């Protein structure tokens, strides 16, 4: 199984051994979110621990910059005078997403994503990818644990 936002070439080329795990991915993901409140995390930003410790203001500054950039992207998507993508129902899709997930549908920060992160820790242990179940606090620099968006 492959979890990805972009369909692999083998799938788009119609390879007979490559198929979707769920026939209607969007409906399945939305139903899972309704039941669990979990939407898989898409990305994480990594900085070497020694570098973060040598530059103690860096983690917070990076978090702040990414948060501000996200707000710019949100505002850009909300601009309806000129569509940002050539999809006829993009505004309705944005409205539907907000109705389901709230205005901040890509949440930043450890606490805002704790449920998702704990599931990742559980799954990586259950699937044998790590020898012991890690705690969320073990994989993030201490200075980032309480950062929240403003």
Regions from the PLM with identified roles:
Residues 20-25, 32, 90-93, 109-115, ...:
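General structural signal for secondary-structure boundaries
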Residues 18, 30, 36, 48-49, ...:
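Generic secondary-structure boundary/loop-capping signal
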Residues 1-78:
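Pocket-lining segment of extracytoplasmic ligand-binding domains
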